Amino acid sequence: MGVNIHELEDYIHNIEPVTFPHQIPSFPVSKNNALQFPPPGSKDAEDRKEYIPDYLPLIISSQEEEEEEQVPTDGGTSAEAMQVPLEEEEEEGEMEDDETVNDENYLSKRPLDSPETMEMPFAKRIRLMNNKGDILDGSLEPREPLSSINSQKVPSVLSPAHKIDSQDLDVSYSDQIMLSPVSKSQAPPPSESKSLIPKTKSKGGSPGQKIKSPKATPISTVIGSPIRSPKSGPKERKSPGCAKSPKSPKSPKVPLAAPPPAIKTETPNRTPLATLSEKIGRENIQIKQNQTPLDSDQLNVEIPSKKPSIADNTIEDSIDAVIARACAEQEPDPFEFSSGSESEGEVFTSPKRLNISELTTPKVSASGINPGKTSSTSVPASGGTSSSDISWTMDDSINEVIRKVSQETPTNTPANNPPCFSSPSASPPTPEPLLKVFEDKAKLPPPVELKKKTKKEQRAKKKKDKDKLKDKERSKDKNKDRSKDKEKDKEKDGTKDGKVLWKDSNKDEDSELHRFKLKDFNEIDSKSKQKENCGKKDKEKHKDKKKDKEKGKKDKDKKGKDKTKEEKMKSPSTPIMLSSKDIALPMISTPNTVRLPSLLSSMSPLLPEKLFEEKEKSKEKDKKKDKKEKKKKKDKEKVKEKEKEKKEKEKEKEKEKKEKEKVKAELSIPAPSPVIPRLTLRVGAGQDTIVISKVVSAPESKAVPPPSLPKSPPPTPSPAPAPVLVVPPQAPPAPAAASPAPTPAPSALTSNAGSSKTPVRSVVTETVSTYVIRDEWGNQIWICPGCNKPDDGSPMIGCDQCDDWYHWPCVGINAAPPEDEQWFCTKCESKKKDKKQKKRKHKAH
C-alpha cells in the first residue's frame, strides 16, 4: 500500500479521527416541537396578544389565508375590489363561525406544515395590511382633508376645473378637493409616511400597488394644490398598497378624473364614466357600507349634511341597481378590503364613512373619482389612524376621531356642494385641514404598527361592526317613522340629482341624521374607544359592545333633550343641513351653491374650533365628572332620603300622638254604659284627662271607693306633674282633691268592658313594674301578678303601695273592701312586717 503507519496514526489523531462506532446520545434529547413557537422576529410574535400564551399557535382560518393570497390579484381590479367587500359581508357570517373556532376556540394541534403556510400568509398579510393601511392612510387622510379641504388653496386649483365641467367637474372637483386636503394633511407627515411606506412596500408593495399609487398621486396632485400634490404623492404611494383595497380600484378611475382636462373629458363621457363609477363606486360603497355599516352609519351621522344631499337624489332606484350589482360581484376576497380597510375603518370609522358618503354623494363621475382618490388618500389616513390606535392613547385617538368626524361633516357637505356647482370656496373648511395635518403627522408613525394588526383584530372588528349594525338597524327601525316624512321631501328634491345615492346611505342618513346629530360626538367617543380597544382583549371588546348598546339606548331616550342642545351647539351644522338640501337642487342651479361657501366658511371655524375642542375635552371630563357627581348625588340622595324618612316617621309619630290624645279626650266624654261611672281626673294643666272606669255591681258600688281610689292615684302621677296625686297610698285625699265627683268614683272600682278597651282607660303610672305594659296606642295594660293575665275587665284591686293590680279571685276577695281601708298585696305586707320587725329590734337595742 505504501502507507506509513505513523503517518496514518498521526492523520487519524489530528486530521480525521475515526468516529466512535457507538452513538453517544446528546442531552437533552431533542424532541419534535409541535407547539409552533413563533420565531423571535416574526410578525406573529409582534402581533400576539398579551393574554395569548406563547405556546399556543396563532390561529388563522384557512379562509383568511386563501383570501389573503387572492387579495393581491383582486386588489388590481376595481370590480374585484368592489366585490370583495360584499363577499366580506356574506362571508362575515361564515368568518365569524370560523373565527370563533379558529381564532379563539380551536386548540387542537396543527400539522407541522401549517407554520410555513402560516408565515407566508402572514407576510402577505403584512403587506396587505401595510398596503391597506397605507391605502387607508391615504384614503382616510384625504377624507379628513376632504372634510378639512382648505377653500383657499383648493379653489385656485379647483376653480378652473369647476369652470371646465359644471356638473362633472364639480363632482370630480369635489373629489379633488377632498383629495387635495387629504394630500395636504398627508403632506406634513409625508416624510414620516415615506419612512413607513418603504417598509410597507418592501414587505408587500406589489408592482400593481406601486402603479396604483402613481395614479392616486396624479389625482391628488391635480385635485390638490401643486404644493399638496407632492405630499399626496408619497402618501398615495402608500395608497398603492391601498389600491388593492376596494378603494384602490376606484383609484384607477380617479386618474381619469385626476387631470382637470381628464375631468372635462369625463363630463362628456360622464354617463359612461358615471355608470362605471356608479357600478364600481356603488358596489364599493355598498361593500364598504356593508363591511363597515356602522362606519357608514357614523359617517351618515357625521356627514348628515352630505346625506341630505344624497337623499335628495333618487336613492332608492340607484340603490336597488347597485345592490343587485354588488350582490353579483360579491365574490372577490372579502379580506382584501375588509382586512385592511375595515380594521382601519373601524379605527377611524368616521373618515371612512365620510368617504363612503362622499363617494356616493358626488354624482356618478364624482363617485367614481372620489372613491378612487379618497380611497387612495383617505385609506392611508385610516391606516395611520389604525396604527395610531395601537400606539396612541385612548384620549388621542378619541380626539382625532372627534376632530375628523366634526371636520368631515362640515367639509364633506361642502365637498358635495362644490360638485353641485358650489364655488370651490364652498368646500373649504380651512381650520379642519390643519387639525388633520397634525393628526396625520401623529398618525403617520403608527402605519408600521398596522403590520402588527392581526386578522383576529380585523375579525373582531367585523363582529363589532355587525353588532353595531344590528343595534343601528334596530334604532333605525324606530327612527324610520320619523325620517320617512323627511326622506320623502328629500327624495323629491333628490330625484333631480345624481342616481349614485344608495338606499343604505339614504336610510342610514335620514334615520341617523336624527340620531347622530344627537349622538355624533357621543358615538364617536364610544366608537373611537372601541376602535382603540380593538387591539385589546376580546373580553374588553364584548364589554365595549355592551356599553355601546347601553349608550345607544340612553341616547335614544335623550334624543329630545339632545336635539335641542345640539341644535344650539351646531347652529352652523344646521345650515349645512339646509345647504345639503339646497345642494341637491344646486346640482342644477348654481345660486344655492353660492350659499354653501358662506355656510361652509362659517361652519369650518365654528365646528372644528368650538365644537370639537369643547366637545372632545368637555365630554371626556364631563363623563368622569358625571360619574363622580352621580355617585355623590346618589350618596347625598340616600342620606337625604334617610333623613326625610326619619322626619316623616317623627311627624307621623307626633300626629299619631296628637290623634291618640284627641281620641282619648273624645273617649273620655261618652260613657261606655250607665252601669260604669267614670272618675275623670284632670292632671296638671288639664292636658291629659285620665278616665278610670270600673264595672261595679250596684250593691258593691258603696264599698268600692277605697280600692277604686288607689287605682286612680297611681295612673295620675306619671302623666302630669300634679303633686296632689303623687301620693298613691293615700287614696281618699287624692280623689277628694282632684276629682269633683267622688261619689261616682266608688262605683268605678271594677273596670269591666271599659277597662278591657285600652283606649278608654288611659292610665299612666310612675311605678312602672313588670306587670304594666303599654299597648301600641300608648295605653297601659295591667297584668295580674297572681295569674299573669292582663286586665280582662273583671274586677281588680290595686295595692296601695306597689300599684300592682290583682283579680279578686286571685287574691281571694269576693266583695269590694271598704273605701277607707288600704289594701296591700302579699309582697308589700311581708315587706311591712319585715320593716316593723326591724324597727322593733332597733328599739329593743
Swiss-Prot record:
Residues 86-102 have a biased composition (Acidic residues). It is found in: Nucleus. GO terms for molecular function: p53 binding; zinc ion binding. One of its GO terms (cellular component) is transcription factor TFIID complex. Residues 175-186, 286-299, 357-396, 752-761 have a biased composition (Polar residues). Residues 452-465, 624-635 have a biased composition (Basic residues). The keyword Transcription applies. Residues 704-722, 729-745 have a biased composition (Pro residues). The keyword Transmembrane helix does not apply. GO terms for biological process: positive regulation of transcription by RNA polymerase II. Residues 466-538, 547-570, 610-623, 636-665 have a biased composition (Basic and acidic residues). CDD domains: PHD_TAF3. Gene3D superfamilies: Zinc/RING finger domain, C3HC4 (zinc finger) (3.30.40.10). Keywords: Metal-binding, Nucleus, Transcription, Transcription regulation, Zinc, Zinc-finger. Residues 59-120, 134-163, 175-314, 330-582, 607-670, 699-761 are annotated as: Disordered. Component of the TFIID basal transcription factor complex, composed of TATA-box-binding protein tbp, and a number of TBP-associated factors (TAFs). Belongs to the TAF3 family. This is Transcription initiation factor TFIID subunit 3. The gene is taf3.
